[in-house]
Protein backbone atom coordinates (compact mmCIF):
# COMPACT_ATOMS: atom_id res chain seq x y z
CA UNK A 1 0.00 0.00 0.00
CA UNK A 2 1.34 3.42 -0.90
CA UNK A 3 0.74 6.74 0.71
CA UNK A 4 -2.02 8.64 -1.08
CA UNK A 5 -1.73 12.33 -0.29
CA UNK A 6 -4.74 14.64 -0.38
CA UNK A 7 -4.80 17.00 -3.30
CA UNK A 8 -4.01 20.67 -2.53
CA UNK A 9 -6.96 22.35 -0.87
CA UNK A 10 -8.66 19.00 -0.29
CA UNK A 11 -11.60 19.20 2.07
CA UNK A 12 -14.08 16.51 2.92
CA UNK A 13 -17.50 17.99 3.50
CA UNK A 14 -20.57 16.26 4.80
CA UNK A 15 -24.10 16.92 3.54
CA UNK A 16 -26.71 18.14 6.00
CA UNK A 17 -27.62 14.54 6.79
CA UNK A 18 -26.45 15.16 10.35
CA UNK A 19 -29.48 17.30 11.10
CA UNK A 20 -31.23 16.79 14.40
CA UNK A 21 -33.90 14.59 12.84
CA UNK A 22 -31.54 12.27 10.96
CA UNK A 23 -32.63 8.62 11.25
CA UNK A 24 -30.12 6.18 12.72
CA UNK A 25 -28.91 3.58 10.23
CA UNK A 26 -28.75 0.31 12.15
CA UNK A 27 -28.23 -2.37 9.52
CA UNK A 28 -25.28 -1.11 7.47
CA UNK A 29 -22.18 0.93 8.04
CA UNK A 30 -22.88 4.63 7.70
CA UNK A 31 -21.18 6.13 4.64
CA UNK A 32 -20.43 9.41 6.41
CA UNK A 33 -18.51 7.66 9.17
CA UNK A 34 -16.55 5.70 6.59
CA UNK A 35 -15.77 8.91 4.70
CA UNK A 36 -14.67 10.68 7.87
CA UNK A 37 -12.40 7.76 8.80
CA UNK A 38 -10.85 7.74 5.33
CA UNK A 39 -10.23 11.49 5.46
CA UNK A 40 -8.69 11.26 8.93
CA UNK A 41 -6.42 8.46 7.80
CA UNK A 42 -5.25 10.56 4.85
CA UNK A 43 -4.43 13.42 7.20
CA UNK A 44 -2.39 11.08 9.40
CA UNK A 45 -0.45 9.61 6.50
CA UNK A 46 0.24 13.01 4.96
CA UNK A 47 1.41 14.54 8.28
CA UNK A 48 -1.27 17.20 7.96
CA UNK A 49 -1.80 17.46 11.71
CA UNK A 50 -0.09 20.30 13.56
CA UNK A 51 0.88 20.81 17.20
CA UNK A 52 1.01 24.61 17.57
CA UNK A 53 -1.63 25.61 20.10
CA UNK A 54 -3.69 28.06 18.02
CA UNK A 55 -3.29 26.45 14.62
CA UNK A 56 -3.71 22.99 16.10
CA UNK A 57 -7.02 23.89 17.76
CA UNK A 58 -8.31 25.50 14.56
CA UNK A 59 -7.67 22.17 12.87
CA UNK A 60 -8.77 19.85 15.67
CA UNK A 61 -11.96 21.62 16.75
CA UNK A 62 -13.97 21.36 13.50
CA UNK A 63 -12.93 17.73 13.06
CA UNK A 64 -13.94 16.90 16.63
CA UNK A 65 -17.33 18.61 16.33
CA UNK A 66 -18.01 16.98 12.95
CA UNK A 67 -17.22 13.60 14.44
CA UNK A 68 -19.42 14.37 17.44
CA UNK A 69 -22.35 15.08 15.11
CA UNK A 70 -21.83 11.74 13.39
CA UNK A 71 -21.47 9.80 16.64
CA UNK A 72 -24.48 11.57 18.15
CA UNK A 73 -26.68 10.26 15.34
CA UNK A 74 -25.12 6.89 14.56
CA UNK A 75 -24.03 5.62 17.98
CA UNK A 76 -27.34 4.93 19.78
CA UNK A 77 -26.04 4.56 23.34
CA UNK A 78 -23.87 7.65 23.05
CA UNK A 79 -26.66 9.67 21.46
CA UNK A 80 -28.94 8.88 24.42
CA UNK A 81 -26.29 9.97 26.92
CA UNK A 82 -25.68 13.23 25.11
CA UNK A 83 -29.39 13.95 24.86
CA UNK A 84 -29.81 13.39 28.61
CA UNK A 85 -26.99 15.86 29.23
CA UNK A 86 -28.49 18.40 26.83
CA UNK A 87 -25.55 18.22 24.42
CA UNK A 88 -26.36 18.08 20.71
CA UNK A 89 -24.51 19.07 17.53
CA UNK A 90 -26.50 22.31 17.64
CA UNK A 91 -25.44 23.22 21.19
CA UNK A 92 -21.79 22.11 21.29
CA UNK A 93 -19.63 25.09 20.31
CA UNK A 94 -16.16 23.70 21.05
CA UNK A 95 -14.64 20.23 21.21
CA UNK A 96 -14.04 20.60 24.96
CA UNK A 97 -17.84 20.74 25.47
CA UNK A 98 -18.38 17.30 23.91
CA UNK A 99 -19.65 14.85 26.58
CA UNK A 100 -17.17 12.20 27.69
CA UNK A 101 -18.13 8.61 28.48
CA UNK A 102 -16.59 6.98 31.58
CA UNK A 103 -14.55 3.89 30.78
CA UNK A 104 -16.68 1.91 33.24
CA UNK A 105 -19.72 2.47 31.01
CA UNK A 106 -18.10 0.37 28.27
CA UNK A 107 -18.74 -2.64 30.50
CA UNK A 108 -22.50 -2.07 30.46
CA UNK A 109 -23.32 -0.56 27.06
CA UNK A 110 -22.24 -1.07 23.46
CA UNK A 111 -20.77 2.25 22.38
CA UNK A 112 -20.46 1.50 18.71
CA UNK A 113 -21.88 2.49 15.36
CA UNK A 114 -20.80 -0.81 13.79
CA UNK A 115 -23.67 -3.20 13.00
CA UNK A 116 -23.19 -6.65 14.57
CA UNK A 117 -22.76 -8.33 11.19
CA UNK A 118 -19.82 -6.06 10.34
CA UNK A 119 -17.89 -6.42 13.61
CA UNK A 120 -14.64 -8.26 12.98
CA UNK A 121 -12.93 -7.81 16.36
CA UNK A 122 -13.62 -6.73 19.90
CA UNK A 123 -11.01 -5.57 22.41
CA UNK A 124 -11.60 -6.22 26.10
CA UNK A 125 -10.18 -4.40 29.08
CA UNK A 126 -7.85 -6.42 31.29
CA UNK A 127 -9.87 -6.26 34.49
CA UNK A 128 -10.26 -8.67 37.37
CA UNK A 129 -11.09 -12.24 36.36
CA UNK A 130 -14.82 -12.85 36.46
CA UNK A 131 -15.79 -9.21 36.01
CA UNK A 132 -17.50 -7.90 32.90
CA UNK A 133 -14.78 -6.30 30.72
CA UNK A 134 -15.05 -3.13 28.72
CA UNK A 135 -15.71 -3.78 25.04
CA UNK A 136 -14.46 -1.84 22.05
CA UNK A 137 -15.87 -3.17 18.79
CA UNK A 138 -14.01 -2.94 15.49
CA UNK A 139 -14.59 -3.51 11.80
CA UNK A 140 -12.20 -3.49 8.84
CA UNK A 141 -12.34 0.30 8.50
CA UNK A 142 -11.85 0.99 12.22
CA UNK A 143 -8.90 -1.41 12.42
CA UNK A 144 -7.29 0.24 9.41
CA UNK A 145 -7.58 3.61 11.14
CA UNK A 146 -6.40 2.15 14.47
CA UNK A 147 -3.31 0.67 12.83
CA UNK A 148 -2.49 3.87 10.95
CA UNK A 149 -2.82 5.87 14.15
CA UNK A 150 -0.61 3.37 15.96
CA UNK A 151 2.20 3.30 13.40
CA UNK A 152 2.18 7.05 12.81
CA UNK A 153 2.30 7.67 16.56
CA UNK A 154 4.86 4.99 17.46
CA UNK A 155 7.58 5.68 14.89
CA UNK A 156 8.43 9.30 15.73
CA UNK A 157 8.68 8.52 19.43
CA UNK A 158 10.37 5.14 19.31
CA UNK A 159 11.92 4.81 15.88
CA UNK A 160 13.19 1.52 14.56
CA UNK A 161 15.51 -0.87 16.33
CA UNK A 162 15.93 -4.02 14.26
CA UNK A 163 14.25 -7.15 15.49
CA UNK A 164 11.23 -7.17 17.79
CA UNK A 165 11.06 -9.44 20.83
CA UNK A 166 7.48 -9.42 22.10
CA UNK A 167 6.81 -10.65 25.63
CA UNK A 168 3.09 -11.36 25.20
CA UNK A 169 1.12 -14.27 23.77
CA UNK A 170 0.45 -14.12 20.02
CA UNK A 171 -2.91 -12.88 18.69
CA UNK A 172 -4.25 -16.41 18.26
CA UNK A 173 -4.01 -16.91 22.03
CA UNK A 174 -5.21 -13.43 23.04
CA UNK A 175 -7.62 -12.28 20.30
CA UNK A 176 -9.38 -9.71 22.52
CA UNK A 177 -6.27 -7.94 23.78
CA UNK A 178 -5.75 -4.50 22.25
CA UNK A 179 -2.14 -4.59 23.48
CA UNK A 180 -1.43 -7.83 21.65
CA UNK A 181 -3.05 -6.41 18.52
CA UNK A 182 -0.89 -3.31 18.92
CA UNK A 183 2.30 -5.37 19.15
CA UNK A 184 1.24 -7.57 16.24
CA UNK A 185 0.60 -4.48 14.12
CA UNK A 186 4.11 -3.22 14.90
CA UNK A 187 5.44 -6.66 14.00
CA UNK A 188 3.69 -6.70 10.64
CA UNK A 189 4.66 -3.12 9.84
CA UNK A 190 8.24 -2.88 11.05
CA UNK A 191 9.70 -6.39 11.41
CA UNK A 192 7.53 -9.00 9.67
CA UNK A 193 10.43 -11.42 9.06
CA UNK A 194 12.24 -11.23 12.40
CA UNK A 195 9.71 -10.39 15.13
CA UNK A 196 8.49 -13.14 17.43
CA UNK A 197 6.09 -13.53 20.35
CA UNK A 198 7.64 -15.11 23.44
CA UNK A 199 4.60 -15.14 25.72
CA UNK A 200 1.95 -17.78 26.18
CA UNK A 201 -1.27 -18.42 28.06
CA UNK A 202 -0.72 -20.13 31.39
CA UNK A 203 -2.86 -22.76 33.06
CA UNK A 204 -4.74 -20.02 34.93
CA UNK A 205 -5.41 -18.14 31.65
CA UNK A 206 -2.85 -15.54 32.65
CA UNK A 207 0.11 -14.50 30.54
CA UNK A 208 3.50 -16.03 31.16
CA UNK A 209 6.86 -16.12 29.39
CA UNK A 210 8.00 -18.98 27.19
CA UNK A 211 11.47 -18.98 28.74
CA UNK A 212 12.86 -21.99 26.82
CA UNK A 213 12.40 -19.97 23.62
CA UNK A 214 13.05 -16.48 24.98
CA UNK A 215 16.46 -17.07 26.58
CA UNK A 216 18.13 -18.44 23.42
CA UNK A 217 16.63 -15.53 21.47
CA UNK A 218 18.18 -13.03 23.88
CA UNK A 219 21.50 -14.89 23.70
CA UNK A 220 21.47 -14.71 19.91
CA UNK A 221 20.52 -11.03 20.02
CA UNK A 222 23.43 -10.31 22.36
CA UNK A 223 25.83 -11.91 19.91
CA UNK A 224 24.50 -9.91 16.96
CA UNK A 225 25.24 -6.36 15.89
CA UNK A 226 21.59 -5.75 14.96
CA UNK A 227 19.62 -3.78 17.57
CA UNK A 228 16.60 -5.38 19.15
CA UNK A 229 13.45 -3.89 20.66
CA UNK A 230 11.70 -5.65 23.54
CA UNK A 231 7.98 -4.96 23.92
CA UNK A 232 6.09 -6.10 26.98
CA UNK A 233 4.08 -5.46 30.11
CA UNK A 234 5.64 -4.47 33.40
CA UNK A 235 4.78 -7.83 34.94
CA UNK A 236 6.38 -9.71 32.01
CA UNK A 237 9.61 -7.84 32.57
CA UNK A 238 9.44 -8.63 36.29
CA UNK A 239 9.02 -12.33 35.46
CA UNK A 240 12.08 -12.14 33.20
CA UNK A 241 14.14 -10.21 35.74
CA UNK A 242 13.27 -12.60 38.57
CA UNK A 243 14.29 -15.59 36.49
CA UNK A 244 17.57 -13.99 35.41
CA UNK A 245 18.34 -13.11 39.02
CA UNK A 246 17.67 -16.69 40.13
CA UNK A 247 20.08 -17.95 37.47
CA UNK A 248 22.59 -15.13 37.97
CA UNK A 249 22.39 -14.28 34.27
CA UNK A 250 22.67 -11.04 32.34
CA UNK A 251 22.65 -10.05 28.69
CA UNK A 252 24.37 -7.31 26.75
CA UNK A 253 22.08 -6.28 23.92
CA UNK A 254 23.60 -4.49 20.90
CA UNK A 255 23.90 -0.70 20.82
CA UNK A 256 20.68 0.94 19.70
CA UNK A 257 18.49 -1.67 21.38
CA UNK A 258 15.41 -0.44 23.22
CA UNK A 259 12.65 -1.51 25.59
CA UNK A 260 9.00 -0.43 25.56
CA UNK A 261 7.27 -1.21 28.84
CA UNK A 262 3.54 -0.80 29.32
CA UNK A 263 0.43 -2.33 30.78
CA UNK A 264 1.10 -2.33 34.51
CA UNK A 265 1.19 -5.39 36.78
CA UNK A 266 -2.43 -6.66 36.80
CA UNK A 267 -1.65 -8.59 40.02
CA UNK A 268 0.50 -10.94 37.94
CA UNK A 269 3.79 -10.23 39.70
CA UNK A 270 5.35 -8.30 42.53
CA UNK A 271 5.13 -4.55 42.04
CA UNK A 272 8.24 -2.44 41.60
CA UNK A 273 8.65 1.33 41.58
CA UNK A 274 9.09 2.48 38.00
CA UNK A 275 12.63 3.74 38.52
CA UNK A 276 13.68 0.46 40.13
CA UNK A 277 12.07 -1.60 37.35
CA UNK A 278 13.83 0.38 34.64
CA UNK A 279 17.15 0.24 36.49
CA UNK A 280 16.90 -3.55 36.74
CA UNK A 281 15.95 -3.87 33.07
CA UNK A 282 18.90 -1.71 32.08
CA UNK A 283 21.27 -3.73 34.25
CA UNK A 284 20.07 -7.18 33.15
CA UNK A 285 19.90 -6.37 29.43
CA UNK A 286 22.93 -4.12 29.18
CA UNK A 287 21.02 -1.00 28.17
CA UNK A 288 21.27 2.67 29.03
CA UNK A 289 18.28 3.89 31.11
CA UNK A 290 17.38 6.30 28.29
CA UNK A 291 16.73 3.29 26.04
CA UNK A 292 13.72 2.27 28.15
CA UNK A 293 10.40 3.96 27.55
CA UNK A 294 6.75 3.77 28.57
CA UNK A 295 3.48 3.69 26.65
CA UNK A 296 0.01 4.68 27.87
CA UNK A 297 -3.07 3.27 26.24
CA UNK A 298 -6.29 1.39 26.90
CA UNK A 299 -8.70 -0.87 25.08
CA UNK A 300 -11.28 1.92 24.75
CA UNK A 301 -8.88 4.08 22.69
CA UNK A 302 -7.44 3.90 19.19
CA UNK A 303 -4.36 6.06 19.86
CA UNK A 304 -1.48 5.69 22.30
CA UNK A 305 0.72 8.07 24.27
CA UNK A 306 4.47 7.67 24.72
CA UNK A 307 6.75 9.24 27.26
CA UNK A 308 8.30 12.45 26.04
CA UNK A 309 11.81 11.32 26.98
CA UNK A 310 11.68 8.98 24.00
CA UNK A 311 11.24 11.79 21.49
CA UNK A 312 13.82 13.94 23.28
CA UNK A 313 16.29 11.07 23.09
CA UNK A 314 15.66 10.94 19.34
CA UNK A 315 16.54 14.60 18.97
CA UNK A 316 13.07 16.04 19.41
CA UNK A 317 11.86 14.15 16.38
CA UNK A 318 8.28 13.75 17.56
CA UNK A 319 7.71 17.42 18.33
CA UNK A 320 8.24 18.33 14.68
CA UNK A 321 7.31 15.06 13.01
CA UNK A 322 3.63 15.77 12.48
CA UNK A 323 3.98 19.24 10.92
CA UNK A 324 5.66 18.00 7.73
CA UNK A 325 4.26 19.52 4.56
CA UNK A 326 3.00 16.88 2.19
CA UNK A 327 4.75 18.55 -0.76
CA UNK A 328 8.04 17.18 0.60
CA UNK A 329 6.90 13.71 -0.39
CA UNK A 330 7.95 14.37 -3.96
CA UNK A 331 11.17 16.21 -3.16
CA UNK A 332 13.18 13.21 -2.01
CA UNK A 333 13.15 14.32 1.62
CA UNK A 334 10.50 11.78 2.54
CA UNK A 335 10.06 8.24 1.37
CA UNK A 336 6.84 6.22 1.66
CA UNK A 337 7.03 2.71 3.09
CA UNK A 338 4.65 -0.18 2.72
CA UNK A 339 1.63 0.78 4.75
CA UNK A 340 1.98 4.46 3.92
CA UNK A 341 4.47 5.46 6.61
CA UNK A 342 6.63 8.45 5.68
CA UNK A 343 10.07 8.78 7.18
CA UNK A 344 12.51 11.67 7.20
CA UNK A 345 15.91 10.14 7.91
CA UNK A 346 17.53 13.53 8.34
CA UNK A 347 15.47 14.10 11.48
CA UNK A 348 17.02 11.07 13.12
CA UNK A 349 20.49 12.54 12.80
CA UNK A 350 19.62 15.42 15.12
CA UNK A 351 21.39 15.17 18.46
CA UNK A 352 19.58 14.96 21.75
CA UNK A 353 22.08 17.35 23.30
CA UNK A 354 20.20 20.37 21.97
CA UNK A 355 16.87 19.25 23.42
CA UNK A 356 15.49 19.23 26.92
CA UNK A 357 14.85 15.74 28.19
CA UNK A 358 12.52 14.80 31.05
CA UNK A 359 14.09 12.45 33.56
CA UNK A 360 12.12 9.44 34.79
CA UNK A 361 12.24 9.37 38.58
CA UNK A 362 9.13 7.32 39.24
CA UNK A 363 8.08 6.82 42.85
CA UNK A 364 5.47 4.08 42.51
CA UNK A 365 4.23 1.42 40.11
CA UNK A 366 2.82 4.04 37.74
CA UNK A 367 4.81 6.32 35.45
CA UNK A 368 5.06 9.23 37.86
CA UNK A 369 7.41 11.95 36.61
CA UNK A 370 7.36 10.39 33.14
CA UNK A 371 5.57 12.83 30.85
CA UNK A 372 3.35 11.34 28.17
CA UNK A 373 2.34 12.79 24.83
CA UNK A 374 -0.39 11.71 22.41
CA UNK A 375 -0.24 12.27 18.65
CA UNK A 376 -1.93 15.49 17.52
CA UNK A 377 -5.22 13.81 16.57
CA UNK A 378 -5.81 13.15 20.28
CA UNK A 379 -6.18 15.63 23.12
CA UNK A 380 -5.74 15.34 26.88
CA UNK A 381 -7.54 17.37 29.52
CA UNK A 382 -7.04 17.10 33.28
CA UNK A 383 -10.43 17.45 34.97
CA UNK A 384 -10.99 18.40 38.60
CA UNK A 385 -13.23 15.77 40.27
CA UNK A 386 -14.65 18.48 42.54
CA UNK A 387 -15.67 21.03 39.91
CA UNK A 388 -15.81 19.03 36.68
CA UNK A 389 -13.71 21.77 35.09
CA UNK A 390 -10.25 21.63 33.62
CA UNK A 391 -7.49 21.77 36.23
CA UNK A 392 -4.73 24.34 35.99
CA UNK A 393 -1.18 23.54 34.94
CA UNK A 394 0.48 21.47 37.66
CA UNK A 395 -2.79 20.53 39.41
CA UNK A 396 -3.95 16.96 39.86
CA UNK A 397 -7.14 15.73 38.22
CA UNK A 398 -8.71 12.93 36.22
CA UNK A 399 -7.40 12.28 32.72
CA UNK A 400 -9.99 12.91 30.00
CA UNK A 401 -9.07 11.94 26.45
CA UNK A 402 -10.45 12.99 23.08
CA UNK A 403 -9.27 10.56 20.41
CA UNK A 404 -10.37 11.36 16.86
CA UNK A 405 -9.25 7.89 15.77
CA UNK A 406 -12.20 6.48 17.75
CA UNK A 407 -14.47 7.23 14.79
CA UNK A 408 -16.76 4.21 15.17
CA UNK A 409 -16.93 4.30 18.97
CA UNK A 410 -16.81 7.40 21.20
CA UNK A 411 -14.09 10.01 20.80
CA UNK A 412 -14.41 11.56 24.28
CA UNK A 413 -13.37 9.18 27.06
CA UNK A 414 -13.29 9.87 30.80
CA UNK A 415 -10.65 7.64 32.37
CA UNK A 416 -10.23 6.59 35.98
CA UNK A 417 -6.58 7.68 35.98
CA UNK A 418 -5.13 10.64 37.85
CA UNK A 419 -2.73 12.94 36.07
CA UNK A 420 -1.11 16.36 36.01
CA UNK A 421 -0.90 18.64 32.99
CA UNK A 422 2.71 19.17 31.93
CA UNK A 423 2.82 21.56 28.98
CA UNK A 424 1.56 19.69 25.92
CA UNK A 425 1.73 16.37 27.75
CA UNK A 426 0.72 14.88 31.07
CA UNK A 427 2.14 13.03 34.04
CA UNK A 428 0.40 9.81 35.07
CA UNK A 429 -0.07 9.41 38.82
CA UNK A 430 -2.17 6.26 39.06
CA UNK A 431 -5.72 5.04 39.46
CA UNK A 432 -8.24 7.19 41.31
CA UNK A 433 -10.33 5.67 44.07
CA UNK A 434 -13.38 7.84 43.31
CA UNK A 435 -12.98 8.21 39.60
CA UNK A 436 -16.11 10.00 38.43
CA UNK A 437 -15.81 13.78 38.13
CA UNK A 438 -18.65 16.05 39.08
CA UNK A 439 -21.20 16.37 36.28
CA UNK A 440 -20.22 13.11 34.55
CA UNK A 441 -22.54 10.67 36.29
CA UNK A 442 -24.13 8.13 33.99
CA UNK A 443 -27.39 6.34 34.72
CA UNK A 444 -26.76 3.16 32.75
CA UNK A 445 -30.15 1.72 33.61
CA UNK A 446 -31.90 4.78 32.20
CA UNK A 447 -29.96 4.58 28.95
CA UNK A 448 -30.63 0.85 28.66
CA UNK A 449 -34.35 1.38 29.19
CA UNK A 450 -34.44 4.02 26.46
CA UNK A 451 -32.74 1.61 24.05
CA UNK A 452 -35.38 -1.08 24.46
Positions of PLM-derived features:
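Intrinsic disorder/low-complexity segments
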Residues: 1-28, 314-368
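Conserved adenylate-forming
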Residues: 126-174
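Active-site glycine/GP-rich loop and adjacent strand/helix microenvironment
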Residues: 25-44, 58-70, 162-163, 167-170, ...
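A conserved hydrophobic position in a structured secondary element of the catalytic/binding core
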Residues: 20, 73, 232
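Active-site diphosphate/adenylate-binding microenvironment
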Residues: 54, 58, 70-73, 77-124, ...
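Short polybasic/polar patches that bind polyanions
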Residues: 83, 141, 283
Amino acid sequence: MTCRLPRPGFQLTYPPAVAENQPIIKHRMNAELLAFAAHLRELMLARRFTRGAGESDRQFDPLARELFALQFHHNPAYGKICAVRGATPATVRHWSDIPAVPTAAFKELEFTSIPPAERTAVFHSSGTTGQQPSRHFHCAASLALYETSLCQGYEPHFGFAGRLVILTPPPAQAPHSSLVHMFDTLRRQFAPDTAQFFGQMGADAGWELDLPRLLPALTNASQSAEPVTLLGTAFSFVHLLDYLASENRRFKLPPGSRVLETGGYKNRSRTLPKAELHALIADCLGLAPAAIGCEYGMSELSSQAYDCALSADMGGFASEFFSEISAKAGSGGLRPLAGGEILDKARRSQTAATRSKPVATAKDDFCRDVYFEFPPWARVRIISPETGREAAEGETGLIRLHDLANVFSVAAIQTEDLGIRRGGGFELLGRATAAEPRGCSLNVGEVKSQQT
